[in-house]
């Protein structure tokens, strides 16, 4: 891996892409320290310290890279864009017009991307309104005035600022994808989580439980190794191509394979589950600010440290893993493409039998992959409960960090291989 990075810096255009990506990420981290207008800067620190052990606050703050804790212009993070992308992907299955756009290639994808941007703005605006009242609810808990002169004009100013911050992040992510290395949106989430690692290390080192301090590094290494193993694991289906006549030449039949990953859905189900499970406690927090017992009970019931949250998140991860795998990989289309180009699976007839065969294999692979995602997402939460650690750094974060790191290294490797440089995969 080190040789890959060093080799990349020796190539001028790749070096420019890496530096451009690093510059955008640095600007993002800078934005998480710029407070939103209309917020009392002196009260922000008191609120952040008071609510450091609040489960929902810690979860939301993690994905904003600490921006929520500082109530910065990037307090929403990139999550509205993630939710909008997931919603559009779900709608492509049930809305015929969107499904048609998906099959129109680059032109259709550009239209879907534009719809995603519009939906992102709407979701960010709605979430900004909710966050303003969430900030107001924090005032009573922290005993400070976070938003002086709570007027309609002040609320509108904060909402517009937070929405604009999300739109700016969306643009920065697209810039990284177009002109940098890796997927821009994923790297922004990656940067948000990595920025919280020092706090996590400090929480581990200062934990009074000596046993926890000793075994935690071994657990972390084991979890990372397991994630890499499953993320890279695949079932290779042999594909045989018959002899074909191209022009006046007879081409020999070739043999290759179709890789089916154990975790075809990647980290999308985990992100989706985390974003959905954050809604009930947030609503409970908003309702409970007026001393409403139902709101308080709802927030406590779905607290990220509670078993109700772990169970609900695990169920959502398993269900959405199956659904997203079905969306991203269509056995019928794959079988038709193989038949069209003269390919077949040895021992399986082309056409419908091939589609049924691929569907069975995919179902067998998806089940353990979904269970693995749910287990990894739940394990750190269980450890936090057992050790009374107050830093929220769950399995969702670990999965995202490792997944994005692997994908980025693969893209960097591909850039090097295009230029005939020796890379990481030897």
Which residues does each predicted region cover?
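N-terminal cationic and glycine-rich segments that engage phosphates or anionic surfaces
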Residues: 1-102, 107-426
């Amino acid at each position: 891996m080190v040789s890959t990075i060093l080799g990349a810096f020796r190539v001028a255009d790749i070096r420019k892409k890496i530096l451009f990506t690093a510059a955008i990420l640095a600007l993002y981290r800078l934005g998480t320290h710029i407070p939103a207008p209309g917020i009392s800067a002196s009260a922000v620190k008191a609120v952040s310290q008071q609510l450091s052990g609040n489960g929902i606050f810690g979860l939301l703050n993690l994905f904003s890279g600490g921006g929520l804790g500082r109530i910065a212009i990037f307090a929403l993070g990139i999550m509205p864009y993630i939710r909008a992308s997931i919603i559009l992907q779900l709608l492509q299955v049930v809305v015929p017009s969107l499904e048609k756009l998906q099959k129109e290639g680059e032109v259709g994808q550009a239209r879907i991307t534009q719809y995603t941007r519009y939906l992102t703005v709407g979701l960010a605006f709605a979430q900004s309104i909710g966050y303003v009242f969430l900030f107001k609810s924090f005032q009573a808990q922290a005993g400070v005035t976070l938003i002086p002169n709570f007027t309609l004009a002040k609320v509108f100013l904060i909402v517009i600022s937070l929405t604009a911050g999300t739109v700016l992040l969306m643009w920065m992510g697209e810039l990284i994808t177009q002109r940098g290395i890796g997927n821009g949106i994923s790297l922004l989430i990656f940067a948000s989580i990595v920025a919280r690692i020092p706090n996590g290390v400090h929480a581990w080192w200062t934990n009074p439980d000596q046993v926890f301090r000793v075994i935690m590094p071994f657990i972390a290494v084991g979890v990372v190794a397991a994630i890499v193993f499953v993320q890279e694991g695949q079932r290779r289906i042999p594909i045989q191509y018959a002899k074909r006549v191209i022009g006046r030449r007879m081409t020999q039949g070739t043999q290759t394979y179709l890789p089916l990953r154990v975790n075809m859905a990647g980290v999308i189900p985990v992100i989706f589950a985390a974003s959905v499970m954050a809604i009930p406690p947030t609503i409970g927090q908003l309702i409970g600010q007026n001393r409403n017992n139902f709101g308080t009970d709802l927030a406590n019931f779905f607290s990220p440290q509670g078993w109700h949250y772990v169970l609900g998140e695990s169920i959502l991860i398993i269900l959405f893993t199956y659904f997203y795998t079905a969306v991203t990989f269509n056995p019928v289309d794959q079988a038709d493409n193989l038949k069209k180009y003269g390919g077949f699976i040895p021992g399986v007839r082309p056409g419908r039998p091939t589609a049924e065969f691929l569907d069975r294999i995919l179902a067998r692979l998806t089940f353990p992959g979904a269970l693995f995602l749910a287990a990894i997402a739940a394990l750190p939460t269980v450890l936090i409960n057992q050790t009374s650690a107050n830093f929220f750094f769950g399995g969702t974060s670990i999965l995202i960090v490792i997944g994005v790191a692997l994908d980025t290294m693969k893209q960097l490797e591909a850039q090097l291989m295009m230029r005939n440089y020796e890379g990481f995969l030897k």
